């Protein structure tokens, strides 16, 4: 739905496990006025390996989204950011806060330096959303199992332009039952705002 709200009309969905259920639910996309085609993995290819199943005549960058991501991010803005920065790969990242339930002690050797009681840390985490140029997809070998972090690291070694897009909108990984339940609870409120 958010892809459609961002103006995206053409979709490729990679399927393997429970493929028929997914295909039966989404069909050809006509009930949403979009075009959906399926990339059927005979063997699991990973989050990046399946990109090799895309048509070879892609002319522009694409958005790649992990299937367990729910977000209000504007995908057209990601593509514009990707293009404006002449990136080969754009990784969407989300700030994630962690809190320690304990006081953290810093030492040098055996010498005490400091103590911070129950500190909070913040770091950027992979949001499972990417913008990718066709030249990156062309580097993937057919039938190669490859996940996106591996593809990104390979392209970093090749000195490709890899940038990060900060996701500030609602985002949640719904790959675990507890986070799916949380999303069920939050989504109606998020979509009303």
For each feature predicted by the language model, list its residue ranges.
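Active-site phosphate/pyrophosphate- and oxyanion-stabilizing loops and adjacent acidic/basic residues
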Residues: 1, 20, 52, 76, ...
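N-terminal glycine-rich phosphate-binding loop and ensuing alpha1 helix
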Residues: 1-20, 34
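Short, surface-exposed alpha-helical segments at coil->helix boundaries
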Residues: 19-23, 149
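Conserved beta-loop-beta/alpha segment of the NTase-like Rossmann-fold superfamily
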Residues: 23, 29-109, 132
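Catalytic-core segments of class I nucleotidyltransferases/pyrophosphorylases
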Residues: 63, 70, 76-83, 96-99, ...
């Amino acid at each position: 739905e958010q892809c459609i709200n961002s103006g995206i009309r053409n979709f490729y969905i990679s399927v393997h496990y429970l493929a028929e259920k997914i295909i039966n639910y989404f069909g050809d996309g006509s009930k949403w006025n979009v075009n959906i085609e399926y990339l059927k993995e005979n063997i699991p290819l990973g989050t990046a390996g399946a990109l090799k199943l895309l048509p070879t005549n892609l002319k522009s960058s694409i958005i790649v989204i992990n299937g367990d991501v729910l977000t209000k991010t504007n995908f057209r803005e990601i593509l514009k950011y990707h293009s404006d920065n002449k990136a080969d790969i754009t990784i969407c990242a989300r700030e994630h806060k962690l809190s320690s339930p304990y006081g953290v002690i810093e030492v040098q050797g055996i010498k005490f330096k400091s103590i911070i009681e129950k500190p909070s840390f913040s770091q950027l985490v992979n949001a499972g959303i990417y913008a990718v140029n066709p030249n990156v997809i062309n580097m993937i070998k057919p039938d190669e199992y490859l996940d996106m972090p591996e593809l990104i690291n390979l392209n970093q070694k090749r000195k490709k332009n890899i940038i990060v897009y900060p996701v500030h909108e609602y985002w949640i990984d719904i790959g675990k039952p507890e986070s799916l339940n949380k999303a069920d609870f939050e989504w109606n409120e998020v979509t009303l705002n």
